[in-house]
Amino acid sequence: MILANDELKKLISTGRLKVDPLAPDTVRENGLDLRIGGEYAIYAYEGAVVKPCELENARHLFRIVKADEVVIPPRNFVLLTTEEYVKMPDDVVGLANLRSTLARYGLVIPPTVVDAGFEGNITIEVVNESPNTIVLKRGMRFLHLILVKAEGRALYSGTYQGQRGVTPPKGLRGEC
């Protein structure tokens, strides 16, 4: 069941869902609109051979940029972080979507689930499929998070729990 405006406001007012900072236009009809944070990550190299199964982490492959504008080259991608620090209830899952207006410019994100019990800034991959450089501004609404009631409870305990700022991917050594 998708949680609508009234249910979202109840979760926030009772402290079960935390969104900090909470702007007046964050809670929407059927989800939360989250904003671009103050840093992003982009690949530091082009043409490198990346072998996730051989890496402990991939931080060295990315350049972290602190800026008021996010520059996404044509047919490239960046990792964006939300301005908001989110703490999810243990029985609610988030489904992340790019705001449709941004998709109409050629931006896409992969299907992304924010697990029940997750806490942190959300890092999301944004791909520019267009032939043009696209420039986004810090603080603009970019991510629409649909919240869905889960059957039962779960507690997220993954690598990205408690992350702050943009977080490059972990390596997959030991998982392959």
Swiss-Prot record:
Give the active-site positions: E125 (proton donor/acceptor)
Q: Where does dCTP bind?
A: R99, S100, T101, L102, A103, R104, D115, Q163
Enzyme class, UniProt record, top EC level: hydrolase
Keywords of the record:
Hydrolase, Nucleotide metabolism, Nucleotide-binding
For whether the record's keyword set contains Nucleus, the answer is no
Entry EC no(s)? 3.5.4.13
**InterPro entries in alphabetical order:** dCTP_deaminase (IPR011962), dUTPase-like_sf (IPR036157), dUTPase_trimeric (IPR033704)
Entry-linked CDD domains: trimeric_dUTPase
Catalytic activity field: dCTP + H2O + H(+) = dUTP + NH4(+)
What the record says about family reads: Belongs to the dCTP deaminase family.
How it assembles, according to the record, is: Homotrimer.
Q: List the HAMAP family hit by this protein, alphabetically.
A: dCTP_deaminase
| Protein name listed in UniProt | dCTP deaminase
Gene behind the chain: dcd
